[in-house]
Amino acid sequence: MTTPQPFAHRFSQLAEQRSPFCLGIDPSRDLLTRWGLPDNARGLRDFCERVADAAGSSVAVVKPQSAFFERHGPEGLQVLQELMRRFKSVGTLTLLDVKRGDIGSTMEAYAETVFGEGSAYEADAATFTAYLGLGALLKTLERARASGAAAFLVVRSSNPEGTSLQMSRGEDGRTVAEALADGLRAFNEKPGQDAAPVAGAVMGATLPDSDRGVIERLGGALLLTPGIGAQGAGFDDLKRLFAGREAQVIPTATRSVLEAGPDTAALRQALERHLAPARAFRATARPS
């Protein structure tokens, strides 16, 4: 078995060939209802087929949120596997949004579920949380590296409830977010390993300018930036917050695309309204 190219390399290639845009896929009960679909596994499969038809091979990354599939039981998980296989068949990177976080042995099992050939999902990347300590995620990060995958850890989220915890200061004066950013950078820059960053960061697109210090601490880590569109952020916000790091950013939107459904043509149009600005945003990282 050969190890795939690192996720960071594959993302960079697709971002240039297609667009750096990441399409979130959150088939909530509300969205299924708005599309006129039943809130069951059959409606879920219909929803996913329409999204996949509309997206084709236009995006670099898709990010299905596993909870919206898990709530339909084993049939929902089967739909999730089918969706990920379909996107992988057209070369699109699959980023499974699970945000798992537990002790080391449990995290190792989670990593075996999502990463690597023969795993349940064979994801190219996944999201995690580090509330039990970054050390509990070391085997997860190593599994990701060995699989050519990436692990995105929540560092600064866009939901207001997260601020009080993420910006709390420890005895060394650093905030929780700053300490986590330092730890991710140290892992990525550990001597004797491939230079491609394995540990990425989830950084909300709606964050204030005061978070630029956290971004600087992350070094060359890839930055997954949910919050474009329905949550209020636009590409001008990305330009402001991530100036100088455009090539590291994975611009992400979900509802602002999916709410255009169920018509496939309307979904394509909504998607294109994000693809072109994402290309233009990334282009600012290259010298003219």
Swiss-Prot record:
The active site is formed by 99
Alphabetic keyword roster: Decarboxylase, Lyase, Pyrimidine biosynthesis
Q: What is its EC number?
A: 4.1.1.23
The record's annotation in InterPro entries points to: Aldolase_TIM, OMPdecase_AS, OMPdecase_type-2, OMPdeCOase_dom, RibuloseP-bd_barrel
Annotated GO MF terms:
orotidine-5'-phosphate decarboxylase activity
SUPFAM superfamilies assigned to the protein according to its UniProt record, in alphabetical order? Ribulose-phoshate binding barrel (SSF51366)
Source organism superkingdom: Bacteria
UniProt pathway annotation: Pyrimidine metabolism; UMP biosynthesis via de novo pathway; UMP from orotate: step 2/2
Note the PANTHER family from the entry: OROTIDINE 5'-PHOSPHATE DECARBOXYLASE
Name the family: Belongs to the OMP decarboxylase family. Type 2 subfamily.
Give the protein's recorded name: Orotidine 5'-phosphate decarboxylase
The organism named in the record is Myxococcus xanthus (strain DK1622)
